[in-house]
Amino acid sequence: MGLEERLPGGILLSTVETVAGYVRKGSLWPATFGLACCAIEMMSTAGPRFDIARFGMERFSATPRQADLMIVAGRVSQKMAPVLRQIYDQMVEPKWVLAMGVCASSGGMFNNYAVVQGVDHVVPVDIYLPGCPPRPEMLLHAILKLHDKIQQMPLGVNREEAIREAEQAALAVPPTIELKGLLR
């Protein structure tokens, strides 16, 4: 004799966090930050063949104040890093970052002083998407993985604490230019 048997039909048992996550995952507004060839693949996901609109992303936002997902597609130079951080800070909460491509994830083949070796040294990244450039199907798969992550995210004070810890961990990692071994 469980609780489900005592309740009348049509009653849903859930938490506020689960319902909020379910609603939030279907209404992402991405801000495009296309810096290289990955941006071409990102643009093709909005076309009729891949149709990113079926996942609630009807339009790509040109302003950070109306976006909650930043897709960083391509390499980030040292001069571009403060601009990227400023755009991230202007985005509304809750916000997520997807590093698209090897250049955004780890600097790619550009291992020099002018390129940031991974966008996670500038902003906290939620999803890493490998490839050079990754196919649109891979971007859609990464967005679906982000949907799963969003649905399980905590709310309120718990979320702020999780974000603070992730940001501190990301900024504490040394850049690959300072690492020794096979990377150099």
Swiss-Prot record:
UniProt cofactor note: Binds 1 [4Fe-4S] cluster.
Major enzyme class: translocase
Membrane topology, record value: Peripheral membrane protein
Record keyword Transferase present: no
One of the record's GO cellular component terms: plasma membrane
PROSITE patterns hit by this protein: COMPLEX1_20K
UniProt KW Cell membrane keyword: yes
Cofactor: [4Fe-4S] cluster
Record key words, sorted: 4Fe-4S, Cell membrane, Iron, Iron-sulfur, Membrane, Metal-binding, NAD, Quinone, Translocase, Transport
Pfam family, one: Oxidored_q6
Molecular-function annotations in GO: 4 iron, 4 sulfur cluster binding; iron ion binding; NADH dehydrogenase (ubiquinone) activity; NADH:ubiquinone reductase (non-electrogenic) activity; quinone binding
Superkingdom of the organism of origin: Bacteria
Enzyme Commission code(s) on record: 7.1.1.-
Catalytic activity annotation: a quinone + NADH + 5 H(+)(in) = a quinol + NAD(+) + 4 H(+)(out)
Alphabetical list of PANTHER family matching this protein: NADH DEHYDROGENASE, NADH DEHYDROGENASE [UBIQUINONE] IRON-SULFUR PROTEIN 7, MITOCHONDRIAL
Known role: NDH-1 shuttles electrons from NADH, via FMN and iron-sulfur (Fe-S) centers, to quinones in the respiratory chain. The immediate electron acceptor for the enzyme in this species is believed to be a menaquinone. Couples the redox reaction to proton translocation (for every two electrons transferred, four hydrogen ions are translocated across the cytoplasmic membrane), and thus conserves the redox energy in a proton gradient.
NCBIfam families: nuoB_fam, PRK06411.1
Protein family according to the UniProt entry: Belongs to the complex I 20 kDa subunit family.
Protein name: NADH-quinone oxidoreductase subunit B
Gene for this chain: nuoB
